[in-house]
């Protein structure tokens, strides 16, 4: 266990960041699953815009890697084009 006050504070801050990042990642994953289940192209396109924004924001904040965000956006775009 940490002995110094600053180390204890870092542990608390890291735990808070971890929870926030996990929430963001889970929200993003849920939105992606919803997009994959949509059969209507117009609805998929509108949902795609929000998912892309979520992925870009997550990549910008280093929650996910930027290449993973790019690959996911590419796969989702291919999925929408197949509808």
Curated annotation (Swiss-Prot):
Q: Which Gene3D superfamilies match?
A: Ribosomal protein S20
- GO function terms (MF aspect): small ribosomal subunit rRNA binding; structural constituent of ribosome
Disulphide-bonded residues? none
NCBIfam families named among the record's database cross-references: S20 (TIGR00029)
Q: What does this protein do?
A: Binds directly to 16S ribosomal RNA.
**Family label:** Belongs to the bacterial ribosomal protein bS20 family.
User: Could you tell me what this protein is called?
Assistant: Small ribosomal subunit protein bS20
């Amino acid at each position: 266990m940490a002995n110094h006050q600053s180390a204890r504070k870092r542990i608390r801050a890291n735990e808070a960041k971890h929870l926030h990042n996990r929430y963001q990642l889970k929200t993003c994953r849920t939105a992606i699953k919803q997009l994959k289940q949509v059969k209507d192209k117009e609805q998929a396109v509108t949902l795609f815009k929000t998912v892309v924004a979520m992925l870009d924001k997550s990549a910008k904040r280093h929650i996910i890697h930027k290449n993973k965000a790019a690959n996911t956006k590419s796969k989702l775009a291919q999925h929408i084009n197949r509808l």
